[in-house]
Regions:
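Membrane-embedded alpha-helical bundles of multi-pass transporters
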Residues: 112-115, 147, 166, 400, ...
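Flexible metal-binding regulatory segments at protein termini and peripheral loops
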Residues: 1-118, 122, 219, 235, ...
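Conserved ATP-binding TGD loop and adjacent catalytic N/P-domain core of P-type ATPases
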Residues: 4, 21, 408, 500-502, ...
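Conserved cytosolic catalytic loops of P-type ATPases
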Residues: 31-53, 57, 189, 218-312, ...
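Actuator/coupling domain of P-type ATPases
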Residues: 57-75, 79-80, 120-123, 127-227, ...
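Signature of the cytosolic headpiece of P-type E1-E2 ATPases
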Residues: 466, 475-588, 603
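Bilayer-spanning, highly hydrophobic alpha-helical transmembrane segments
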Residues: 96-105, 334-362, 374-382, 387-392, ...
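Conserved catalytic phosphorylation-site environment of P-type ATPases
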Residues: 276, 372, 382-458, 614, ...
Length: 736
């Protein structure tokens, strides 16, 4: 695994889904490539390969040989992508303008002035520049693919326009061929030119619409400053962001975006972290506090010591995750890819069959009809609509989720979320604030002076979230110092134990209390009932088999938890709560939230087993926790969801990360997944229906019934509209 790398490269010169398939097939054939996929909507190649066998330069060389190009240089890669997209759009715009300037008079001659002298020759002269100068890219693209034994949309456009033009050219210079047979020598120069004009117009609209699908990622990238001021040998200098190094001292002034992740080395201020945490209130930052790249300094100037720079910052990782998710393929896309891979050859076969049937059934009188119908079949067929149906919906859906602080790892996660019927919620840090405080102390007997010192020392070594509450409370008391423990051991799911001056001390749940055979007095038991019935957790502190104290710990329920549970139920999702707290505490919390099913006293293994049991019942389970603990349950769940709270830890362990502590993001995430998958199905349905209905009509299936024969010009307009309509439908999700 150490020699394997995964990279994403922008792809240039792709025109359709067939192009994406060609690039993908080319790269997959290279030695050392493990997996490769091309996203037509984002024009991105994602490839996993062995570094010892292959280099980005060699990948690019193979793609160039196939008629396309890659941007492999890491420096300013996104800027280059944007620049190339802008150039492509500008070129397309001028081609569209130029083509229509010639097409309009061509249509006038073909429809109104067809009987004036030299009308055919004038139409030919007007059509040639449209074919050569404005539509030349279709012909060169088709020729490159033909040399490789492949085909794409360029092939369809080049063949259809060439057939119409060459047929017209023959009729212009050899009209006697038809006159001798009692037939009229029709010309279709306008068809060849209008096809190119419409296809170019469609591609222009498609490019513009596709650009709008990446709005969310551009907003995220806009949070990255281009330059930073650093202190080098006591002198302040401005450098490009790419040249920052770990350990650099970075100067940030009021109103500026922070360029790195790091700690405040000097100064203090308030920082707007809403882009990551979702919290609108600026956070006070003092010396030693952590700050994140992309957040905004509100007030004073300060100096940061860089800890993570470039691609290692939380913001950069969020951007990379969103880009990778947008470029991933939904399960249904694998089927679509297979269809688009054979789409053009099948259409070519249908076009040939169409011409043969017309001539066979109708004889020489129907040669013109046969040619027109074959041209219409070639023109109306659209692999682009199929190729764009899934990725554009994914781009908009995942981008919208990111803008709402929901990070979805890939298309598979999005698809799985739609199927979830049970959500399992860990209590601490998910339903509650995750900032517990010690609210009550019950001492079983008179305290010895060192008891609190031992308790403080033991809890300072513990990683359990409740330990912090005890540490904070003890540190507020005077004269308490952590004892020098002889040993320390963490007991998974139960607590901790430590030795001090020949005695074994323990701190943890009532399960640890039982393990040490300690008992609770009647008086303490009565107080315990009151504490736990109010939703407080209980921590037991003892020495050997003697209970020394019970500490009541309160972790407030989040303000949005009850509403989130209600909304999930409205969506038809069952809710379960898991907690390591006792039965009374769990009952009190679940009752307040309206959760009927819960499991108390749950160890990590118990939580994993609970998820497994639900799955054995045929349920699709989503596990929601803080992204740090309960890794077993997360790994088992059909969908793993972590409450990230603005950290990068959760991004590594979950399929979905909620970047803020607001639990209302959870029902939003499920709703968005359903909307996105529904949109994908809509797009695919209309793309398939369009081709299933359009191709037979273009072939002339309605002609025997009502004499209707589809004009190639209308066929080209329909083809252009089909792909644009798919993209526009995807964009509608962003407005919901």
């Amino acid at each position: 695994m150490g020699n394997t790398t995964k990279k994403a490269f922008p792809v240039l010169n792709m025109h359709c889904a067939g192009c994406a398939n060609n690039v993908e097939r080319t790269v997959k054939k290279l030695p050392g490539v493990i997996e490769a996929s091309v996203n037509f909507a984002t024009n991105t190649l994602t490839v996993s390969y062995e570094k010892e066998q292959l280099t980005p330069g060699e990948i690019r060389a193979a793609v160039l040989a196939a008629g396309y190009d890659l941007i492999v240089e890491e420096a300013h890669k996104e800027e280059r992508r944007e620049e190339e997209q802008h150039k492509r759009y500008t070129r397309l715009k001028w081609k569209v303008i130029g083509a229509w300037i010639l097409v309009v008079p061509l249509l006038v001659y073909s429809m109104i002035l067809m009987h004036v002298p030299y009308s055919n020759e004038i139409q030919m002269v007007l059509a040639i520049p449209v074919m050569v100068f404005f539509g030349g890219g279709f012909f060169t693209g088709a020729w490159k693919q033909a040399k490789l034994g492949r085909s794409n949309m360029d092939t369809l456009v080049a063949l259809s326009t060439s057939i119409a033009f060459l047929f017209s050219l023959f009729n212009t210079f050899f009209p006697e061929f038809w006159y001798d047979r009692g037939l009229e020598p029709h010309v279709y120069y306008e068809a060849s030119a209008v096809i190119i004009a419409f296809v170019l117009t469609g591609k222009l609209m498609e490019e513009r619409a596709k650009g709008n699908t990446s709005t969310a990622i551009r907003k995220l990238m806009g949070m990255q400053p281009k330059a930073a001021r650093v202190l080098r040998n006591g002198v302040e200098e401005e450098i490009l962001i790419e040249k920052l190094q770990v350990g650099d001292l970075v100067v940030v002034r009021p109103g500026e975006q922070i360029p790195v992740d790091g700690q405040l080395s000097e100064g203090d201020s308030y920082v707007d972290e809403s882009m990551i945490s979702g919290e609108p209130v600026p956070v006070e930052k003092k010396k030693g506090d952590k700050v994140l790249a992309g957040t905004i300094n509100q007030r004073g100037s300060f100096i940061i010591r860089a800890a993570q720079v470039g691609s290692e910052t939380v913001l950069a990782r969020i951007i990379a995750m969103v880009q990778e998710a947008q470029g991933s393929k939904a399960p249904v896309q694998r089927i679509v890819d297979r269809i688009t891979g054979i789409f053009v050859p099948v259409v070519l076969g249908i076009a040939i069959l169409t011409f043969v049937l017309w001539v066979t059934i109708g004889g020489s009188e129907y040669i013109s009809y046969g040619i027109l119908s074959a041209v219409s079949v070639l023109v109306i067929a659209c692999p682009c609509a199929l190729g764009l149906a899934t990725p554009t919906a994914l781009m908009v859906g995942i981008g919208k989720a990111a803008s709402q602080h929901i990070l979805i790892k890939d298309a598979v996660a999005l698809e799985q979320m739609r199927k979830v019927d049970v959500v399992v919620l860990d209590k601490t840090g998910t339903l509650t604030e995750g900032h517990p405080t010690a609210t009550g102390w019950l001492w079983a007997q008179s305290q010895e002076p060192h008891f609190k010192d031992v308790l403080l020392a033991a809890e300072m070594k513990s990683e359990h979230p409740l330990a912090g509450a005890i540490v904070s409370a003890l540190q507020d008391e005077e004269k308490i110092k952590p004892a020098a423990l002889d040993s320390f051991e963490s007991i998974t799911g139960k607590g901790i134990k430590a030795s001090y001056e020949g005695h074994t001390y323990w701190v943890g749940s009532h399960k640890l209390l039982k393990d040490f055979s300690a008992t609770v007095s009647d008086v303490m038991a009565e107080m315990l009932v009151l504490y736990e019935s109010d939703g407080n957790g209980s921590i037991y502190f003892g020495r050997e088999n003697v209970l020394l104290a019970i500490i009541a710990v309160s972790d407030p329920i989040k303000a949005t938890s009850a509403e989130a549970v209600k909304e999930l139920k409205r969506q038809g999702i069952d809710i379960c709560m898991l907690t390591g707290d006792g039965q009374r505490t769990a009952l009190a919390v679940s009752s307040r939230l309206g959760i009927e099913r819960f499991v108390a006293d749950a160890l990590p293994d118990d939580k994993a087993e609970f998820v497994r049991e639900l799955q054995m019942q045929g349920k699709k389970v989503a596990m929601v926790c803080d992204g740090i603990n309960d890794s077993q349950a997360l790994a088992l769940a059909d969908v793993s969801i972590a409450m990230g709270k603005g950290t990068d830890i959760a991004m590594d362990v979950a399929m979905v990360t909620l970047m803020t502590s607001d639990l209302l993001l959870l029902p939003k995430a499920f709703q968005l997944s359903k909307q996105t998958v529904k949109l994908i199905h809509q797009n695919l349905f209309w793309a398939f229906i369009y081709n299933l209905i359009g191709i037979p009509i273009a072939a002339g299936i309605l002609f025997p019934l009502n004499g209707l024969l589809l004009n190639p010009m209308l066929a080209s307009a329909a083809m252009a509209f089909s792909s644009v309509s798919v993209v526009l439908n995807s964009l509608s999700l962003g407005r919901k």
